Structures are given as C-alpha cells and as structure tokens.
Amino acid sequence: MNVKKGVFAGRFPLVKKMFLCAAGVMSFWFTCNDVIASPRDYNSTVCLPDSSEEILYNGIRLPEAWPPDTESPESITPMRVPYLENIPDIIPIDVGRQLFVDDFLIEETTLNRVFHQAEKWEGNPVFFPETEHELGERHKNKAVTYLGHGGVFYDPSAQEFKMFYTAGWRGGLALATSKDLLRWERPELGLAGENLILPPGPLMAGGDNAIWLDLNAKDSAQRYKAIIERLHGWRSNFNTRDDSPTHTLHTSADGLIWSQGITTRRAEDYSSFFYNPFREVWSYSIKKSVSGRKRFYAESKDFMRGASWENMVYWVNADSLDEPDSEIGNTPQLYSLNGIAYESIMLGQFYILLGPYNRVCEEGRFPKITELKMGFSRDGFHWDRPDRRPFIEATRDEKDFDRAYLHGTMGVCLVMGDKLWFPYTGYSGISPDGYRGMYTGASIGMATLRRDGFASMEAGKKKGILLTRPVTFRGKHLFVNVDCPDGELQVEVLDEQNRVLKQFNAKTSRPIRTDKTLQKVEWQAGDDLSDLAGTPVKFRFHLTNGKLYSFWVSPDKSGASHGYIGAGGPGYDGVIDDKGINAY
C-alpha cells in the first residue's frame, strides 16, 4: 500500500452626518476636520493580545509574541506555516466542517488531494454600468461599476443580499440589493442621488473603500464598519507619496449614514480588514510598497480603537511560487488580501498583480492583470497556499468583461444551498461606446464552487483510505460531504492506539453511494456517537471511485456544523450554520 504520511466595545460620538434639510435638499456636512479625527480624541488604545499563551479552538497554540514579527518583506520565500510543522496531538473539531485543504487533520492516506477552481456563472456579468454616475467619464475612464473592495453580504433582517460598490472610476459609494445574487436592483436612497450613499470626492466616498456587515455587533450603531481611502488627489499622491492621512475608519447602524472618521496610520490604497471570529479580533490588511506591493498586519479587539495599528507587523507578499505571466514577464505582486471565516478555517482571497506597469497600461489604454488566488489559514495570520493556479482567472480577451484587473470583495463568498458564490469585478478596458481606458469597462460577475469544494481527497477504482489524527468532539452524528454515486464510502472509528471500535467498524458501516454536500454516516448499530464525546478517536474513511470534501460531527440530525458560512446566505439567521439541511 502506498501510504502518504500527513499528506465592539463602546459607542463613538457622531459629530456631523449627512442629513436631509427641511426643504428636502441633501446637504453634506463633511469637511476635512469633520472626516479626519485622531484616535487619541477618543482615548483609543490598541487591544494588544494577552501575554499568556493562547490556545485556539482547534488546539493550535499561539506564541506569546503576537502578531509574530518573524518575516521579512524583502524575502520571496513562501510563508512558513508553524501549525503545520507542529500539529496538536489532539484536535478539537466542534467548530465547523473539517476541510482537507492541508494535512492538519490527516495522519495517513492513500487518497490523492485535488484542488478546484471556481466556475464562472454562464450569465456573467450580473451587474454592469447603467446609470449616469456609472457610465460617465471620471479621471479619463468610463463605464465602471466595481468592487474596490466594497462588500457583498447577506442581511437576514432584510432577507436580501446587499452589495456596496463604487459607481464610476473613483466615483461614489453605491448600494444594490438582490434576492439571488443574479438579479440586482438599485434602490432610490434619497441621499446623494439615485442609489448613491456617498458622492464622489476624497472627503466623501474617497478613492476606494471596504465595507463589513457585522451581524454580531454589540452596539447597533456599529453594525456596519468601513475603511475609506482619503487621497486628496489620487494621482498626485502616488507621485509624491506625502505623509498626509490616507484612510479613515467609520461605523454605521444601517450602512447609509456613517460616523465621523478616525484616521489610521499611513497606508496605501486597497487596504482593508476582516473579522476573525475564532479569536474575536479585527484584522487589518494593510498595503505598503517595500520593493513592490506587500501586506502588513495589525489587529484589535475593537474595530475603531484599533485605528492606530500600533502592533503592525510585516505579513505576506507574492512569493517565488507565484509565476509571472508568460507574455508580460513582470514579477508578481500582492495587490490586496481579503479574509473571511468559512466553517473551521479562514479563507484568504489573494489579488495577484501580474502587470504590465501602470504607465504601460495608461499609454496603451488597457487594464493591468490581477487574478484571484486562494489561501487557507487556521490561525488567521499564517497562510498556506498549496494551489497557485488562479481560483478566478482573467481571460486576457478584450471581448470579455473579465479580461483583466479582477477584484474580489469584502465577505469573499456567500452560501446558497450546496454552493459557494464568489462576487468579483472584471475590467474589459472598453466602454459600450467604444472608449478605451486603463480603468474603463468594469462590471461584476459571479463564480461558484461546490460547498467545501476547495480541495477533495480522491480515489479511483482501487479502494483508498484516509485516517485522521486523534480528534475530540461533543456532538452525536457524523456527516460527510462526498461525491461517489458510482463508488462507495464507508467509515470506521478507532481509538488512539488504532484499535477499531467494534460497533463502528467498516464492515457494519452502511455504504454511502451518493453525491451530496451533507450526508449522514450510519452503522448497523446506529448513528449516535455521543458515548465517544470528549474521548480522542480517529476516523478512517474507505473510499472507492469518489471524492471526499469534508467531515464533521453535528449535535443534531440536521447536520448543522456550527461553523462559519462566509458572508452569510438565505436560510440562516447569521453567519453560523445552526440550520444544517434546513437551510438548503
């Protein structure tokens, strides 16, 4: 047998907001002093991690010095992932579906791991320039609706998807809504005209933005969170690189009326943030150029009070495994990085810039190429990037809306039934009237992936096995995500000494011959594993002619994983799967 071993606390005062005057005319009471305030105005302090050792939900132990300042921005060596070098002896699996994106869960296997790319929706683009704000010329570019970063989230209170996007190149911040991610409406907001939330301008919508819907906000006034770039002249700023404030943090109760901004430390455009619920911290993804575009990291328990980024460290960049475009030849760079909690891991959406250089694109009036790749993390900081193919690829064909300059969005992905949905922006470089420009012709599309479908462990006609490391759980029912309608899956349970438990052996495991993203495992003795709760055990999967994507132990027969579901989806009350099959 060919065996592979281990293949928000406190409310911030709102000074001046946008409001409708008595005559019904919109007034904007943002001035430089209004928008830009210092963190010390609110006695802000960065919530530094406790000096004691931190043990995560999955048994990973973090070092006392956190975030770790161990890497160099000058290095192109792939990021070390310490938890894959020092895996816990026993892994708790109470949180979420357990994915096979790395060897963290695997003691030994004869199955082959295969990574999968997203499939673009055949009806793309699903959202494109239509209004005067979107079609009009700004900064020598036209016909633009883009996620930069914006945000796409499911709002269970409104029972709809909300998309925050930019209308026009460096234009206003706008809102669109949808019931299915495919058909979108532009609600009349009565704020800045049509569906605009904030009009264009460095003190209003800014250069780019990143929006987050925080369904677990302790203060309802901070349900929405945002970072907005404040370049007073975006082109001149890139030339001078002066030290003027460039970003502000904001909160909002409804995503429409926003608080006064708190300035951050110096950073470049396309800086963003995400929430790590496993550690209950806000993680800031900060763009800085050090021999090319790189990412720096800071974190805080409180979103607004973390604006000072006092614990900022170098984080990650494109590395030696990111291949250049064969025709362009430029060294790849990390343009942006968004994160989201999905089931038991953090997903990282890496924007990899392949060139050409900006001046070449401006002179030629065509877009540069960025593509979206995926990374995976179990501690929210260290990224494992085993598959360097584009997860969503630029076509490089000017007839396509996603020819180049692909962007993902805040929230990264959403859940509907047995699929994950990934919103993304693409640029063709051409407007409907034939006008060409580097940042022209931007529309928004969707890409899908099987739920948990980032990687599968696969067997052919010859039976293969996968043995997990010792795990513990408090649930009762074992579930799998498996594709084997022409094959078979059986499961057995072992103790730490690899002795098969008689009542849960492979011979009495009821054969599974199906293609389902949520399938219960049963034995002749039943399906109740509660007697094993708290006891370290191993699962051994026997697979023929099939693909195994994930497994988990649920406390109830619905198969609810109690893991995270990205930016949410219909059928869920929040961003945790407590519904199981009832949300399908």
Each model region followed by its residue ranges:
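N-terminal secretory signal peptides that target proteins for export/translocation
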Residues: 1-15
